[in-house]
From Swiss-Prot:
Name assigned to this protein: Photosystem I reaction center subunit IV
Stored PANTHER family: PHOTOSYSTEM I REACTION CENTER SUBUNIT IV A, CHLOROPLASTIC-RELATED, PHOTOSYSTEM I SUBUNIT IV
Primary subcellular site in the record, as a coarse category: membrane
Keyword Membrane: yes
Keywords in alphabetical order: Membrane, Photosynthesis, Photosystem I, Thylakoid
Entry's Gene Ontology BP terms: photosynthesis
Pfam families found in the cross-reference section: PSI_PsaE
Gene Ontology cellular component list: photosystem I reaction center; plasma membrane-derived thylakoid membrane
UniProt family annotation: Belongs to the PsaE family.
Originating organism: Prochlorococcus marinus (strain MIT 9301)
Annotated membrane topology: Peripheral membrane protein
Gene3D superfamilies the UniProt entry points to: 2.30.30.50
Role according to the record: Stabilizes the interaction between PsaC and the PSI core, assists the docking of the ferredoxin to PSI and interacts with ferredoxin-NADP oxidoreductase.
Length: 69
């Protein structure tokens, strides 16, 4: 499948907040770790600090959990 930096991908991990959402690959680690793709999204998740509007907008995924959009 060969996902690389800058690709638009759709998340296929069912338990993820961003399931079926499209994000942009920020980096791909080739050292052999399981969740080697860092994906950045436009919207933030629900994990913001109390009293702020923010949350995380990146997450790590395995290549098998992503498909090119």
């Amino acid at each position: 499948m060969a996902i690389s930096r800058g690709d638009l991908v759709r998340v296929k991990r069912p338990e993820s907040y961003w399931y079926n959402e499209i994000g942009k690959v920020a980096s791909v680690d080739t050292s052999g770790i399981k969740y080697n793709c860092v994906v950045r999204f436009d919207k933030v998740n629900y994990a913001g600090i109390s009293g702020t509007d923010g949350g995380a907008n990146t997450n790590n995924f395995a290549e098998s959990e992503l498909e090119k959009a």
